[in-house]
Amino acid sequence: MAVLAKFISKNHPSVPIIIISNAPESAAASVAAIPSISYHRLPLPEIPPDMTTDRVELFFELPRLSNPNLLTALQQISQKTRIRAVILDFFCNAAFEVPTSLNIPTYYYFSAGTPTAILTLYFETIDETIPVDLQDLNDYVDIPGLPPIHCLDIPVALSPRKSLVYKSSVDISKNLRRSAGILVNGFDALEFRAIGSHSQRPMHFKGPTPPVYFIGPLVGDVDTKAGSEEHECLRWLDTQPSKSVVFLCFGRRGVFSAKQLKETAAALENSGHRFLWSVRNPPELKKATGSDEPDLDELLPEGFLERTKDRGFVIKSWAPQKEVLAHDSVGGFVTHCGRSSVSEGVWFGVPMIGWPVDAELRLNRAVMVDDLQVALPLEEEAGGFVTAAELEKRVRELMETKAGKAVRQRVTELKLSARAAVAENGSSLNDLKKFLHATRD
């Protein structure tokens, strides 16, 4: 939400924004210096002893526990100023009834982008037309605004019809149609299929839907400061030829087994290409050692670091992703397909290889490969394992072949479209103006 708040403030600095959250105030440090943005911290709710421990279910349930505190906060703020709109992250659907009970126009924001927004909007129809668990269907689902999506590419958490996440998703789908509008981290050229579907039959699926505003891509600022350990890789990139380095980075959730790390190392060595690789400690070793920092000599094949030292750089854990993608030496990006990573890859014009690791990421890959054509797919074995031969093949394909050149050309075109969307009179800034105008009515 902080990135969205900064985007609104940058383009409309006179609009006052209050971020309401129960996260520590340190989480709002990035907006502390912006006069139009303030932070209201909610008290942490009391957690019932029988609360679910499932990570995904917690995303949906924790906001419900904060509803009494949210109601109090909105009432207090309303005594000082008129609240023209509330924007909810879609994970905070449980809070929808709080602002609407106060007659405050309530919008949903999808930072995860259009594929997730469309799937969520369509989910009530899926619930009514597909009577079995999605993972058992073994077929494609036709969703207006998306390419044909195989059921195995729909987040696995949505499969058990009796699960809390499934029921919450149906509830969100219904509330989306009751909301004042939907804000999506995307832009016209990136969402051409969704926009075409919406214009032809206004995404009505189960009835009329509210306006959809594409206001992206929301890409944070690039920090090119040198000298700190985490930016050492940027100095290494300075010594590499233009568009020669393959960057591998997999987000917060991209943690691989020791076996997969060895397989990845073999692929990179055999490919012969330059690489920058962000490695995190495997779950089994992190649990045993209590450390996030991997022991590269122990994890990677014997002699790998020495043999590849002239063309490879391995980062322990965190990598400055935006800064790396912005560097001229980077010519390819192996990504977990998270929306932020996809947006950054497009923004900086870096062709991608899609390696989804969780949740909505398979859905994102399907769109990246089939619709946008900005990525090559990786074929996975059972359990999501990727062989060295498969990864080597895709790296070579991206960096050496006509297919890779076509992906590079397409992502370069979208890079220009992305920057045009957030320039003066661009499509995303125009949608932002429409949204703000709607809140003044």
Curated annotation (Swiss-Prot):
Q: Which family does it belong to?
A: Belongs to the UDP-glycosyltransferase family.
Q: Which reaction does it catalyse?
A: baicalein + UDP-alpha-D-glucuronate = baicalin + UDP
Activity control, as annotated, is: Inhibited by copper, zinc and iron, p-Chloromercuri-benzoic acid (PCMBA) and 4,4'-diisothiocyanostilbene-2,2'-disulfonic acid (DIDS), but not by N-ethylmaleimide (NEM), dithioerythritol (DTE), calcium or magnesium.
The entry's description of pH dependence is:
Optimum pH is 7.5.
Q: Outline the subunit composition.
A: Homodimer.
Organism annotation: Scutellaria baicalensis (Baical skullcap)
What Gene3D superfamilies does the annotation carry? Glycogen Phosphorylase B (3.40.50.2000)
CDD domains recorded: GT1_Gtf-like
Encoded by which gene?
Answer: UBGAT-I
Q: Which SUPFAM superfamilies match?
A: UDP-Glycosyltransferase/glycogen phosphorylase (SSF53756)
Question: What molecular functions are annotated in GO for this chain?
Answer: baicalein 7-O-glucuronosyltransferase activity; UDP-glucosyltransferase activity
Q: Which domain of life is it from?
A: Eukaryota
Q: What is this protein called?
A: Baicalein 7-O-glucuronosyltransferase
